[in-house]
């Protein structure tokens, strides 16, 4: 013969369990009372709010059960805040003070059953109503270097009005893997030291590109470093203003107009700096006439090559950071 999990309780215990049920009903009534305001919210917002409030309610009940146990053992009680105010607060406190000492996992199961039974959207309990991992997402950030007040005049950027580049009605987006092990490399200590010496240098610091240099990359007559979109480790290092400044439209592509781009700075591990231009370059194929998009560093790249003694087959890495809000690159030669 099946028995309910509270059949072993005496009359007082059953009464306490009954009051717990009343508490759940009361919580459900409060949600129904707020139905009009919730109708104005999206389904996702409504569900997130329900998850959060039910999670807090379960935690509250668990803490009050702990408080009841401490009081029974003779320990001094601790003050516990509730979710509700006014008459509803006093009514709920009356029931909460007599809750049975059930494990929190049982309380969670109980509230999940009550919530599911009354949920008009038929939300399954398998959606992990009380999974707090959904609300505790962390993000690893690069170190931020702040030695002095950032000055917009210390690092200048030239903006030009451009249209968004389009090819055959489709925009070509850079491909990158934000979760690659390469992109997760730690910031080199030398870069942090260089940034401390720069006025207005700050993070976030991002590793965006790695390459084995070709003969063309170090050829003086070319005087530029091409960075293919699909070889980027990440493409979130530009501000909206910078993206507009380096963008090109169809007319500019056909006219092969010289692009201005944005002014940028490259530094090496010896704190030496070079001023360059950063822009988008279109490499057209002779047969098809289709263009491939690249980022490019030019108008000073030869100085970077000679100053760092770069040659073909050298492995380099490019990191980005900010100087007074302006895009800067750090060149690491391996």
UniProtKB/Swiss-Prot annotation:
Predominant subcellular localization, coarse grouping: nucleus
Chain residues forming the annotated DNA-binding region: 229-334
Gene3D superfamilies (UniProt xref): DNA-binding pseudobarrel domain
Region feature (Disordered): 69-89, 133-178
Basic residues bias: start-end ranges: 161-173
DNA-binding as UniProt keyword: yes
Molecular function as annotated in GO: DNA binding
Pfam families hit by this protein: At2g31720-like
PANTHER family in UniProt: B3 DOMAIN PLANT PROTEIN-RELATED, TF-B3 DOMAIN-CONTAINING PROTEIN
Transcription regulation as UniProt keyword: yes
Protein name per its UniProtKB record: Putative B3 domain-containing protein At3g49610
Subcellular location: Nucleus
Stored InterPro entries: At2g31720-like (IPR005508), B3_DNA-bd (IPR003340), DNA-bd_pseudobarrel_sf (IPR015300)
UniProtKB keywords: DNA-binding, Nucleus, Transcription, Transcription regulation
Biased segments, Polar residues type: 73-84, 141-157
One GO cellular component, as annotated: nucleus
